[in-house]
């Protein structure tokens, strides 16, 4: 069925899946990822939008800053260990934890990938404007990659954030927030900039 919808060896495919809406998949999510690997072959790449489970956003003040007294209680983003955001589904976390998976370093726009070009897709992901020109999303467009929406609604397509970033719209709002990231084994609070989406 995956070949019938146009997937082919060597393709780069970003998948968004809502498994409850997709219906029964024999073998579950692992079987789906294995089937994608079979179709794409060793040169193909599977990508997912992971984001991360950053439950502290309700604590931000109007300036996008976390109160100093709470900082020690908030774990930093670690590309190797931080879970994918739960709202992004089981497939995102499954791909993130697969053997050989790579993950990009931008907390809010992070992607994980497995396959032939996983390292290239996830390398050099800018910390500011994470949906922009040097993102896994831009690289997916560059290689004419595909997006597989499996039971997920169209508004879940993270590639739309890349289009929003590129759109020449006057007065686009810039959001600045502090984010804890792991740098050489210690937590560093860094202010990030992103277009509001």
Describe the residue ranges of each PLM region.
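N-terminal and secondary-structure boundary signal
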Residues: 1-197
């Amino acid at each position: 069925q995956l070949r019938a919808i146009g997937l082919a060896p060597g393709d780069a495919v970003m998948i968004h899946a809502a498994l409850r809406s997709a219906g029964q998949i024999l073998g579950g999510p692992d079987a789906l990822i294995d089937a994608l690997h079979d179709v794409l072959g060793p040169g193909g790449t599977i990508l997912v939008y992971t984001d991360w489970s950053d439950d502290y956003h309700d604590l931000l003040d109007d300036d996008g800053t976390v109160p100093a007294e709470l900082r020690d209680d908030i774990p930093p983003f670690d590309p190797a260990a931080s879970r994918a955001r739960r709202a992004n589904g089981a497939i995102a976390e499954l791909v993130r934890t697969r053997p050989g998976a790579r993950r990009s370093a931008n907390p809010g726009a992070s992607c994980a990938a497995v396959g032939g070009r996983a390292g290239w897709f996830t390398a050099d992901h800018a910390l500011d404007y994470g949906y922009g020109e040097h993102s896994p999303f831009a690289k997916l467009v560059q290689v004419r990659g595909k997006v597989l929406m499996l039971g997920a609604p169209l508004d879940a397509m993270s590639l739309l954030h890349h289009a929003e970033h590129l759109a020449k719209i006057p007065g686009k709002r810039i959001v600045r927030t502090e984010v804890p990231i792991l740098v050489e084994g210690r937590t560093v609070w860094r202010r990030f900039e992103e277009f509001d989406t």
